[in-house]
Amino acid sequence: MANHVSSLKRARQTVRKTAVNRANKSRVRGSLRSLREAIQKGDVKAAQEQYKATASALDKSVQKGILHANTASRYKSRLNARVKALATQAA
């Protein structure tokens, strides 16, 4: 266990930040799950709406330093391709 005042403070900060980061990651994963379910069902309108929400959640997590920018970009690119493929398939 930490003994110095500064290391005790850092330990407290880590606990708080870990909780916040875990909540944000969970929110992003839930959004990704909802989008994948909409794509799986073949619901174009719901998939497009959910993609907007998911892209926003990914961008926010990048701004907060939870995800790397390239990781979020990769997710958005692949998911957008799946949504567009679903839209062209339905049309």
UniProtKB/Swiss-Prot annotation:
It holds the Pfam family Ribosomal_S20p. One of its GO terms (molecular function) is structural constituent of ribosome. GO terms for cellular component: cytosol; small ribosomal subunit. One of its GO terms (biological process) is translation. Belongs to the bacterial ribosomal protein bS20 family. It comes from Acidobacterium capsulatum (strain ATCC 51196 / DSM 11244 / BCRC 80197 / JCM 7670 / NBRC 15755 / NCIMB 13165 / 161). This is Small ribosomal subunit protein bS20. The gene is rpsT. Keywords: Ribonucleoprotein, Ribosomal protein, RNA-binding, rRNA-binding. Binds directly to 16S ribosomal RNA. Residues 1-31 are annotated as: Disordered.
